[in-house]
Amino acid sequence: MTATIIDGKAVAEAIRNEVKAEVTQLRAKGLTPGLATVIVGARPDSVSYVTSKRKTCEELGIRSIGVEFPEDVSQDELLARVRQLSSDPQVHGILVQLPLPRHINEEVILNAVDIDKDVDGFHPVNVGKLGMKGREPLFAPCTPLGVIELLDRMGAKISGSRAVVLGRSNIVGLPVALLLLGRDATVTICHSKTQALAEVCRQADILVAAIGRPRFVTANMVKPGAYVIDVGVNSLPVLNPDGSPVISEKTGKPKTKLVGDVDFDAVKEIAAAITPVPGGVGPMTIAMLMKNTLRGAKHAFGLL
């Protein structure tokens, strides 16, 4: 058996097109969704992420409200701006790019985001609702939502399945486990203290890896015919046959490559379907952010 490779780029593009079509319909009625992105400082990775999000907004017809602060902004000033955005009727989603500088309490800032504009899904109220039966939050975190979306679009049967989640982070592991549980999967969360890990993983019809350990999941940990979703993103050096690092002619530095938490080449011979790294879960995050922003706007417009 050779697994179907789940093309996250293609699925993300389909979602963006769906969002764009709905946004176009809303704008024709004079209703424009708006997403505010708040960034503090100029970390290259944060700037890159925020720029990508703002560009996607423009492509889909979503109003992009960019808010930039210097690294030394006071917590009070940042807090005041977030509260202002929370009360702005033209803003339907607020994203505060993390990490924030050390002198700012991230929890205080994130808690100031209106729960009906918490498109990242990290407000304690939304997280709490995610864990309560019958209390579906308006938003769930984007990457876990992307995992579920990929499974759905691949035709995976979630209800009644055995799902194993490797990792218990607040960003991916816990929320994806709760989303799977909410879809009536029988869920096991594994972590560094889990005993007989390979045996537990082999029971999974759906295996989600989100631990940040390169190629940790090997073929002997995967049940034949399982759906394997690799959320991990790890950087490894590119090596010559003799084991020495390959040096880039352009930069003079060792070349690196991205790999996931799953040994892709081995596991693809066992699984029914698998996400690659890169090109699997990664592209889904911004697509689901746009979908959450649209959802927030529809909620504000009384259309949900």
Listing of model-derived features with the role each one plays in the protein:
Residues 35, 57-72, 187-189:
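Short beta-strand elements in bilobed, periplasmic/extracellular small-molecule ligand-binding domains
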Residues 39, 95-99, 166:
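Short beta-strand segments
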Residues 40-55, 134-231, 236-245, 254-268:
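Glycine-rich phosphate/diphosphate-binding loop of Rossmann-like nucleotide-binding domains
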Residues 107-114, 118, 127, 232-301:
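Rossmann-fold NAD(P)-binding glycine/threonine-rich loop
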Residues 32-41:
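Short beta-strand segments enriched in small/hydrophobic residues
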Residues 77-89:
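Short, well-structured alpha-helical segments in soluble
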Residues 93-159, 200:
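Anion-binding alpha/beta catalytic cores of soluble intermediary-metabolism enzymes, centered on
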Residues 1-31:
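Positively charged, low-complexity intrinsically disordered leader regions
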